[in-house]
Amino acid sequence: MYRKVKAYILENEMIQENAWVLAGVSGGGDSMTMLHMLLRLRQELGFSLRVVHVHHGIRGEEADRDAAMVEKICGQWGVPFICRRFDVPSLALSWKCGTEEAGRMVRQKAFQEEAALLNTDNYQIALAHNQDDLAETLLFHLSRGSGIRGLASMRPVVGKVIRPLLCLRRQEIDHYLKENEIFYVTDSTNLTDDYTRNKIRHKILPEIEKELNPKAGEHMAKTAQILSMAEDYFTRKGREMLDRCKKEEQGILIGMEIFQEDPLIVSYGIMEAFYLLSSRRRDFSAVHVQSVLSLAKNQAGSCCSLPYRLMGIRKYEGVWIGKQTEQEKRQLFFHEEWEIFPGKKADTLLGTFETRIFLYQGEKIPEKKYTKWLDYDKIKNK
């Protein structure tokens, strides 16, 4: 198994010579296996190692136990240890997002800040995702509805992020832990089926492997790799399309002639325009791409709102995507009013809306960015 991971790291050129590796270690079996292997590889591949543990301030004494355990093991193994503490529930309220999203953001912040302290660009951030995580992520995105990018989202190398264990199944990791007598902790939230990913992990994927194919998870991982290659190709073509568009200070103008070309390439070009203007890929989806494509078929003056204060406007010569000004905001929000009836979908300039009225019986309110529950008794002028 050690040789397998070493070969995978070399094959994907994950770690450069004399690099720093910041290993994200939660204390769970996956991250402890990764840390143990990186320690063995440190001398062979010639890199420096540092552990970053993120305390989310969610699980109370259990989270304190995890941090203390990782710090103790790092002391025994001679690895520098950094613990970053955040109050994720409070940050989630402040940032108006779910705790899972806030947790992702603070982890990213922790790694970025620790990397900045290294004063070198020769570093990697090692995460302990395995092949089962890859299969579960593919199933998760597939069930929610996703394009190629979502289905191919977990790769061995993405920028500074590396995933050395992506070649291993979870059962291989369990075997390595026992064989090397590595102590680890178990996050109690991973044992429940309260989260969609846990249901996929504990019920759906095992059932698929039991009833259909025992290597289904492995095949899904290979499919994700193929989709990654397709994603790279279409992204490259989208950038080539964007190179032929007119760049302006506040936006990008996509000429009408471009909308006559391959729609998939045009869609990728639009996604690259979103990234160029916002420096973000998250929160942009096929819905926003379709909104821009629809503008090409509308009359001049039509517009749509996009994430991160961007908007699209139909002009005579094409579709402009750029940052909202005060004048453009007024054009967008005071364009017209819409009636949205319960149980039916309504396509508006702001996107597609659907409403539903139901009796609340104490269910857990979902923390989703585009799904909101409103108390009917508190709505005025209803």
Which role fits each region the language model picked out?
Residues 1-206:
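Core alpha/beta nucleotide-donor-binding catalytic domains of modification enzymes
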Residues 2-29, 48-50, 54, 86, ...:
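AMP-forming adenylation/ATP pyrophosphatase catalytic core
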